[in-house]
Swiss-Prot record:
SUPFAM superfamilies membership: P-loop containing nucleoside triphosphate hydrolases
Residues that hold K(+) according to the record: 225, 244, 246, 249
GO biological process: tRNA methylation; tRNA wobble uridine modification
Pfam families noted in UniProt: MMR_HSR1, MnmE_helical, TrmE_N
Species: Chlamydia abortus (strain DSM 27085 / S26/3)
Upper lineage: Bacteria, Pseudomonadati, Chlamydiota, Chlamydiia, Chlamydiales
Binding site for Mg(2+): 229, 250
Protein known as: tRNA modification GTPase MnmE
Location (main, coarse): cytoplasm
Residues reported to bind GTP: 225-230, 244-250, 269-272
């Protein structure tokens, strides 16, 4: 990548909209923009806005609002100019073409963020968080990405790095002065133990972070013809599942994404639980059981007009709600259990507001104590931390067995390098290019 030229790109999504933004960054950003803008751009103070027109070859393209951010007080750390024009395809495209004709280069995907990283404005963790913020399709994913972008994950990595450096300095003194009396090894042991605890906490957050980012899984389960598929359709406002009076219609797992107050829920319809000699239906029942085991919560659906069937043991092990569906046909019977119960009707909508409120309250309880916590969602981060942990455990064992300090120092240096792989201070350009190539153009 050429790092000293000036790049330009449209920073807003294509299509109709009230405004579009063209972004320019680099050493010639101000001079190039001055060639097409009606005002004297070099005279503008940093972080000011100016209304004017953009023209090229004697023809006015559009009225624009120009924002100028001089280096180093900009996102990229370079001189940056943004031109806000009317939305749509033609205005921003012609402005971009004029900038390129005057000497700017079309930006590569993620190149603005890559320049911000290379100029020390953000680290690699924060750069990756930008992409995750853009891609977030629910509030949990958005909050996790924002947490990373605000530097909370980076602070954890810096803390680990400091503990490793302190331990390494201690060990290197031993290697340099072997004739001296062996000092107490408890100090580096304590530092390594603290670093490993931080790493373990981060690694342990990965599964939960993935679940939060991908959505909470809730299974609709119960006996045949209780109305599970009807409830799926009613909750999602879609005719997603086939609904008939024939028992055993649902034979496979059916998953639908459902947004509730910004939270993503993976709502799963499953085959009715009963004894059957049909091998296809039996396969569906086994898949339903597996889905319940893998889920985070179960909505156990029962027919209010029928005698209550026995409850499966799994309902006592998982967060579960008993739903008496078809409450428009009959008053639900009394069931002696500690599990919460709710009468609903997928047909009339009765109880559906209460059901949504129950799910929302349950999800809020799951979030208690998680605000501000760092969650991993990247497999890259998870893998690097596992390698880091291996190196530190090896160094810790070396200290305990009084291995040669050179061996321990080698393990610590490798662990330190992995912290650089996370932050980007120790990573090759090929991997960097691969990471930033996933970004959109203009970011």
């Amino acid at each position: 990548m050429i790092k000293n030229d000036t790049i330009a790109a449209i920073a807003t999504p294509p299509g109709e909209g009230s405004i579009a933004i063209v972004r320019i960054s680099g050493p010639e950003a101000i001079q190039i923009t001055d060639k097409i803008f009606s005002g004297s751009v070099p005279s503008f103070s940093s972080h000011t806005a100016h209304l004017g027109t953009v023209s090229y070859n004697g023809q006015q393209i559009d009225q624009t609002l120009l924002l100028i951010m001089r280096a180093p007080r900009s996102f990229t750390g370079e001189d940056v100019v943004e031109l806000q024009c009317h939305g749509g395809y033609f205005s921003c495209s012609q402005i971009l073409a004029a900038l390129i004709a005057e000497g700017a280069r079309p930006a590569l995907p993620g190149e603005f963020s890559q320049r911000a990283f290379l100029n020390g404005k953000i680290d690699l963790i924060q750069a990756e968080a930008i992409q995750n913020i853009i891609a977030a399709d629910n509030l949990d994913a958005f909050h996790i990405a924002q947490n990373h972008f605000q530097g909370h994950f980076s602070k954890k990595v810096q803390q680990i790095s400091s503990l490793i450096i302190e331990s390494l300095a201690f060990i290197e003194v031993l290697a340099d002065f072997p004739e001296e009396e062996q000092p107490d090894m408890q100090e580096p042991m304590n530092r390594l133990h603290e670093a490993i605890l931080i790493i373990d906490d981060l690694i342990a957050s990965f599964d939960q972070g993935q679940r939060l980012a991908q959505g909470t899984s809730i299974v609709l389960a119960g006996h045949p013809n209780a109305g599970k598929s009807s409830l799926l359709n009613a909750l999602t406002n879609k005719n997603r599942a086939i609904v008939t009076d024939i028992p055993g219609t649902t034979r496979d797992i059916l998953e639908e994404n459902w947004m509730l107050q910004g939270k993503r829920i993976r709502l799963i319809d499953s085959a009715g639980q009963r004894e059957t000699h049909n091998p296809i239906e039996q396969e569906g029942i086994e898949r339903a059981i597996a889905a319940m085991e893998a889920s985070e919560a179960i909505l156990w659906v029962m027919d209010a007009s029928q005698p209550p069937p026995p409850l499966p043991e799994i309902l006592m092990r998982k967060p579960s709600l008993l739903l008496w569906n078809k409450s428009d046909l009959a008053t639900p019977p009394h069931l002696e259990t500690t599990l919460p119960q709710l009468a609903v009707s997928a047909k009339t909508g009765a109880g559906m507001i209460e059901l949504k409120q129950f799910i929302q309250q349950w999800m809020q309880k799951q979030q208690l104590g998680k605000n501000g916590k760092v969650f991993l969602i990247s497999s890259r981060h998870h893998t690097i931390l596992q390698h880091m942990r291996t190196y530190l455990l090896s160094a810790q064992e070396g200290l305990q067995s009084q291995s040669p300090p050179e061996f321990i120092a080698l393990e610590l240096r490798q662990a330190l390098q992995t912290t650089g792989n996370l932050s980007g201070s120790e990573i090759n350009e090929t991997i960097l290019g691969e990471i930033f190539s996933r970004f959109c153009i203009g970011k």
